[in-house]
Amino acid sequence: MSARHDDSDLTWLPTREGEEPWTIDDLEEVRSELLSERERLTADLAESEMDLQDLMRDYGGGSGDDSADTGGKVLEREQEMTLTNNSRGLLAQTERALERLDAHTYGVCENCEQPVGKLRLQAFPRATLCVSCKQKQERR
């Protein structure tokens, strides 16, 4: 676990042209949101993994089930796997954002090293790319 820096000096937090500088309240609001999200995702992930284990245990190869029942169970299992993987990804992104806050690299685009933007981060605290780089990524 990395040591936290002094958060009273926020000069390390970049902003885009025309944006107000970060305040301690802004930073604490983002940190609080990320911590709450981490807690929620951790609980969701634990529940999803238990549900998935139950589905795997209940799926006995379909003996005695007709093909519609078997297909329904397979679909349900695949949906639960998708939800579980999505939760894992969101949790990893949330952890990464918290690490970047502690390392004082939060708010810097991981691609072009320009500011991600205060407004973007307040709307989507897990963002690691500025809007321009995110759009380029999505076009690929």
Where are the regions a protein language model picked out?
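Interaction interfaces in information-processing and related assembly proteins
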Residues: 2-103
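Residue-level signature of catalytic and energy-coupling elements of molecular machines
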Residues: 34, 112, 121
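Residues immediately within or flanking Cys/His clusters that coordinate Zn2+
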Residues: 88, 106, 127
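Short, cysteine/histidine-rich loop/knuckle motifs that typically chelate Zn2+
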Residues: 111-112, 132
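Short functional micro-motifs and their immediate structural scaffolds
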Residues: 116-117, 138
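Short linker/helix segments within small regulatory modules
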Residues: 120-126
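Topology signature of small-to-medium multi-pass alpha-helical membrane proteins
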Residues: 123, 138-139
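Cysteine-rich micro-motifs
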Residues: 127-135
